[in-house]
């Protein structure tokens, strides 16, 4: 406590809604503090922190606020490295659009995929917000449940108007789904306070939330050392695809599979997969690329975790080397 107070004083003595030196990752309950049925995202600690960020310059904070945010993110890095060490599981990322509704077939496919990967011993990590990111954490959360129960959970979310049109209503349904199927299995979320009003989803027990989106994105891709699945998304997903491709090309953190969900989207509608495949052939990592329409086909790239596989240290060492942590 004394160290926290001294650090706060050194950063201007300003009262902030977040701890400058968090000693662990956030939980869903931490960031939902203040919420009650009928309330929207602004009532939560998560929403209050975003409002604070917006009021203090957003992406261009003043010096003391910027120092406080960067210090916070450093401590989150350390907490994340510790969590990855304790998890002792290989990490697979699932990326995709935040606007994908639960009624979209790809949302249900990602739920099924994340559940299967969790059953196989992987730790699923996503961006922590809604859409495909929510589907990834939801699927992991429901890994021990039946297909029927997963269908019921997805249908409950699909029957709501959607977060964009009814924040309070959507949150209430999502909280209800979480409570109905508690306790859920573990997964990880790595979100950011950059995107306006974007809430955490309700299904990730461990949350490494950052102020800096560039630090967050780099870490999110780097820790997924067992591979990344890319569902359809927009510009943010496209950025993640090419950033991950660059990491594979330069062997920044070794090389890992890049698997694309939805052949029509990636091969025909956007042409992203053929373009990336040509570059991957030139740069020597084409064997890591694949595209599929169904979870069963994607799972062929990610076998059941071999007995005794020590995946504890790889994501942690990658993060620590990248951040120069000790």
Task: Cite the ranges covered by each PLM segment.
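Short beta-strand segments
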Residues: 93-97, 127, 189-192, 231-232, ...
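Acidic/glycine-enriched connector segments
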Residues: 131-230
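Short acidic, glycine/serine/threonine-rich loops at helix termini
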Residues: 136-139, 200, 240-243, 270-273
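C-terminal functional extensions of proteins
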Residues: 220-222, 255-326
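Glycine/threonine-rich flexible loop motifs
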Residues: 103-105, 238-242
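Short, charged/polar "capping" segments at the starts of alpha-helices
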Residues: 5-8, 102, 197, 265-271
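Glycine-rich beta-alpha loop segments
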Residues: 1-172
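Short, acidic/small-residue loops that bind anionic groups at enzyme active sites
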Residues: 121, 148-159, 231-232, 238, ...
């Amino acid at each position: 406590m004394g160290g926290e107070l001294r650090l706060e004083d050194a950063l201007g003595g300003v009262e902030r809604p977040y701890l400058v030196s968090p000693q662990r990752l956030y939980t869903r309950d931490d960031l939902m503090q203040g919420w009650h049925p009928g309330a929207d995202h602004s009532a939560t600690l998560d929403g209050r922190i975003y409002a604070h960020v917006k009021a203090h310059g957003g992406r261009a904070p003043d010096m003391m606020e910027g120092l406080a945010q960067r210090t916070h993110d450093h401590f989150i890095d350390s907490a994340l490295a510790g969590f990855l060490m304790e998890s002792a599981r290989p990490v697979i990322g699932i990326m995709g659009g935040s606007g994908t509704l639960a009624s979209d077939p790809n949302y249900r496919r990602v739920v099924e995929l994340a559940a299967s990967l969790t059953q196989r011993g992987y730790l699923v990590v996503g961006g922590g917000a809604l859409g495909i990111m929510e589907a990834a954490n939801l699927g992991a959360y429901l890994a021990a449940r039946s297909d029927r129960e997963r269908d019921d959970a997805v249908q409950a979310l699909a029957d709501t108007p959607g977060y964009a049109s009814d924040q309070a209503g959507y949150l209430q349904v999502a909280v209800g789904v979480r409570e109905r199927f508690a306790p859920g299995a573990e997964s990880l979320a790595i979100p950011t306070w950059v995107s306006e009003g974007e809430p955490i989803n309700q299904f990730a027990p461990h949350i490494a939330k950052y102020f800096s989106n560039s630090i967050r994105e780099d870490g999110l891709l780097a820790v997924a050392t067992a591979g990344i699945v890319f569902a359809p998304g927009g510009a943010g997903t496209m950025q993640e695809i090419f950033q991950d491709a660059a990491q594979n090309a330069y062997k920044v953190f070794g090389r890992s599979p890049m698997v694309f969900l939805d052949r029509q989207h990636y091969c025909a509608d956007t042409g992203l997969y053929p373009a990336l495949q040509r570059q991957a052939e030139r740069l020597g990592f084409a064997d890591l690329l694949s595209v599929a329409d169904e979870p069963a086909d994607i799972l062929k790239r990610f076998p059941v975790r071999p007995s005794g596989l020590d995946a504890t240290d790889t994501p942690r060492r990658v993060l620590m080397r990248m951040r120069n942590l000790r």
